[in-house]
Amino acid sequence: MLEQMGIAAKAASYKLALLSSGEKNRVLEKIADELEAQMESILSANVQDVEQARANGLSEAMLDRLALTPARLKAIADDVRQVCNLADPVGQVIDGGLLDSGLRLERRRVPLGVVGVIYEARPNVTVDVASLCLKTGNAVILRGGKETHRTNAATVRVIQKALKACGLPEAAVQAIDNPDRSLVNEMLRMDKYIDMLIPRGGAGLHKLCREQSTIPVITGGIGVCHIFVDSSADIAPALKIIVNAKTQRPSTCNTVETLLVHQDIAERFLPALSKQMAESGVTLHGDETVMQLHGPAKLVPLKPEELDNEFLSLDLNVVVVENMDGAIAHIREHGTQHSDAILTCDMHNAARFVNEVDSAAVYVNASTRFTDGGQFGLGAEVAVSTQKLHARGPMGLEALTTYKWIGFGDGTIRA
């Protein structure tokens, strides 16, 4: 089955690569319209997925990721329309010039070809990835988690209907709707057809892909994100940032999981933090110093292993550190190179933090929640890469392209 999907996807990618920006935008507009027109069928499938997942004991954080509402589906359709408004990078000349040999050389952006994406209980990913791949002239093979297989199947049918209506091959967007996990291992070996693989899931999935895939893999999306409260931090705005970073949508990978507090501000800051977290319904997981805090927030002892895990819930590690060195060392040991922030009024400390924390996104006096394709002005994102090759941070349109060198001559030969 996968062999035939790969053959069809590769054939479709050749046709997509030749489309103009206008032709690609018309397809995206049609997809957005069809998502709204077929909302009832998609939501009906999603209800079945959510009910099954709840019966299987899926966590509330994962159920939140899985669930669609009319408002969420409308927002997904609007995101597709936003992709239409983004500049098409395909065909863009990156650089070039006339060489001494007389050869005119240019480096031009081109589609990758076929992209494979493996993801879990995130039905929005189906549309986000499909729209970005189509905008950049790529075909895509999707493998969502078993929790979303009804929703994904319904969504892909809508997308394929739009493709067909626009005279394009339905194989431009395909989904592996069989929940058999053995198919993942088979997909990892499809380097003959898939040019890049993006796993969006937990550490286990990423490890499997890195170890077993014969396809170039871009990993990311695991966010053990930190905020360091420096000794010079202004407490009131610092608390506002922390509340946003923890509570706006706890199930996301850019949510803060560990708060590092400079010991010189701890005595003044921690009581205010406890009060604010109690109002926000956040449970604090504190180290020995924090456990001595008497405040209204729910407080439990921090377990060492929690420093390396995503809570994806209203839980927050709080650790008091001796100084900036301690904060940076902690992030290097426990961070996932996703998003980390410093709250400070000392711009020298801010500059040092930015230079020494090796994460895809580093913030000064701002929430980690900004690490997102839409917030960065990239449109919907395929993933947030925490590696350094071929892309880093939110992966927008350019991350779905490569380049080719093109030489123009006039009977030009090498001397």
From Swiss-Prot:
Pfam families, sorted = Aldedh (PF00171)
Q: Which reaction does it catalyse?
A: L-glutamate 5-semialdehyde + phosphate + NADP(+) = L-glutamyl 5-phosphate + NADPH + H(+)
Q: In which pathway does it act?
A: Amino-acid biosynthesis; L-proline biosynthesis; L-glutamate 5-semialdehyde from L-glutamate: step 2/2
Keywords, sorted A to Z: Amino-acid biosynthesis, Cytoplasm, NADP, Oxidoreductase, Proline biosynthesis
Instruction: State a GO cellular component annotated for this protein.
Output: cytoplasm
Q: Where is it localised?
A: Cytoplasm
Instruction: Output one GO BP term.
Output: L-proline biosynthetic process
Keyword check for NADP, yes or no: yes
- EC number in record: 1.2.1.41
What the entry lists under Gene3D superfamilies is as follows: Aldehyde Dehydrogenase, Chain A, domain 1, Aldehyde Dehydrogenase, Chain A, domain 2
Q: Which GO terms describe its molecular function?
A: glutamate-5-semialdehyde dehydrogenase activity; NADP binding
Q: InterPro entries from the entry?
A: Ald_DH/histidinol_DH, Ald_DH_C, Ald_DH_N, Aldehyde_DH_dom, G-glutamylP_reductase_CS, Glu-5-SA_DH, GPR_dom
Domain of life assignment: Bacteria
Q: Its family? A: Belongs to the gamma-glutamyl phosphate reductase family.
Q: What is the purpose of this protein?
A: Catalyzes the NADPH-dependent reduction of L-glutamate 5-phosphate into L-glutamate 5-semialdehyde and phosphate. The product spontaneously undergoes cyclization to form 1-pyrroline-5-carboxylate.
Q: Under which name does UniProt file this protein?
A: Gamma-glutamyl phosphate reductase
Species source reads Salmonella paratyphi B (strain ATCC BAA-1250 / SPB7)
Lineage per the UniProt record: Bacteria, Pseudomonadati, Pseudomonadota, Gammaproteobacteria, Enterobacterales
Recorded name of the encoding gene: proA
